[in-house]
């Protein structure tokens, strides 16, 4: 009966890519509407690119310049010094009656040329200003006079209201560091983790590399940097992500909802508001009305990663994947209880309202129809090894091209999960761990991992985001997520009964059920992929805990960098957990440069190891604190060097790829690329949009996100500063490893936080007050901070 109902609804209305079109509607009218939408999008794109390209100037500045030239001509002055007369000679001779028109056109041409020359000069000046990185080396909060002058000039040349891509033409290219300096830094970074003999061998290989291979490789790499936008980012995307043949579960990352608040317990309502907000963000993105991100409020960052946020799918290949990006998509693909649906997001009048989208999602939740044969676990193929999925996809494309296109051509993927998630009072620790695990891997078959991101809506109204990593890094998707949470909760809000605001639309067609007419021959492949996905998912040990005894405000009182503070805490905790030091990966962004992505900060330094050993030997607080400050200064120097394009690993990676392309065998570069990161760390950015006042609404903050470990015997750790007085850690490891335990490391991190804080006079009470307490104290503060999830919130009652 359900299939017959879907068939009848399909006969009554067909869904184009956006508007619902009745069969009786004239075909030429639909062609006209589609063409009109396409031309509107094209014109808007051209206009927005023009506005972004002329920043810091505006079209009004051209009009002012043209008017000034016309006024000068009326006063018998020639501001062009004879150039306008030359332009008149090049114009057609229309007779004496058109002499004024010739003067008008020559003035317009001269004004345009002068305007373009001024804009070009401003862009060159801004690029020179943005190439300066001396401000990074200054102590935080102590800005010198030259830096203040530089900042004032940057603000002047940046214009008043820059658009998202306004700075792309002015951003400098990422520099190629010196090979000698990179090798020196590399040897310095591995000294703490290598024995004497191993270090001597590494030094010998490095010297041979500098003598035999480095000059030629460096020359070719320098040539590449002159010919491309970024000398390493394209190779990083291709060889690290798109050529990786492993499961995407290993490289995705996730983002969580508000930790203490659930705006509505209604799954369909939360999905409606969230999808509407995401599409509002896409609308702003297409019109470039999102403000560019400014580091420390003054230095613009590259916005190139925003371009492939929506309408993007990673298409598997036998040897290499590729990213397919569409200019527009007017539907989302939805998964619920093993079934796929296509939900149109637009009507002829524009974007559907949140209430209309809620109605669509509620129809899906109420649909009792079973999954088609092979449909329920089909998405497990996207979690399979990429070469296997590429081969099976050809068969899927042959037999179910329409359904596959509906999923891959969607704006993004939505998963309506049948289970609740989020923090619970009954078992807060286990509930957070399960929440993280559900976002990272799901059940192996309920996420389409190829999509740029998947919006996950749980049965109790909790949200989450699962992000494919190749198209962008965490700060970019984090900006999207902050906007989504703030807008859907504070600006859109919910009615008192928990539904989206507005009224249902009885004329709205039902969602389109996708039909997968798949051959039985792919059943073994689906079963194999499902077993592999469940094995990978079941092997991930996730642990999330909020640390509430102190946060960023306390660390500020200690006059140290909050990120460096946490990195040294992690070194101390990991040493207590494993009894040894290891290569540590901390992600730093290189978006100060055009198309920059990330660089590695090797946080396990000689100075950090000296501090950790002093703490382990229980030396005096004064001595440990002195070593701590030295280690913090070293970490800050490494971080700033990485951000300014003087890091280690991306340069060595590019040299390695160049050596492979030139068929050169370098034992040194091979050894470097075979190194294992047993500790992979990252700080989750927060308050990029400034849409939520965390001081007045401290509960309305995301608890961040996390990722899987980079090694079978390693840890993946992310951390986020929640407001001023709490830190949330996300720890992951493999259950199959006998050397790691996420919960054990979490306890070491808590103890290390208290121990390091007690070194400072303002934090000495921490060690006395909390040492030896049961770890359940982490969640004791929830009783006074958790908001009842059954109480809907909206912008009005906030």
Curated annotation (Swiss-Prot):
Its main location: other. The active site is at 469 (proton acceptor). It comes from the Eukaryota. It comes from Mus musculus (Mouse). This is Palmitoyl thioesterase CPT1C. Residues 759-798 are annotated as: Required for interaction with GRIA1. Disruption phenotype: Knockout mice show decreased food intake but higher susceptibility to obesity and diabetes when fed a high fat diet. Mutant mice show extensive learning and memory deficits, they exhibit impaired motor and instrumental learning as well as detrimental hippocampus-dependent spatial and habituation memory. InterPro entries: Carn_acyl_trans, CAT-like_dom_sf, Cho/carn_acyl_trans, Cho/carn_acyl_trans_2, CPT_N. The chain crosses the membrane at residues 53-75, 104-126. The lineage of its organism: Eukaryota, Metazoa, Chordata, Craniata, Vertebrata.
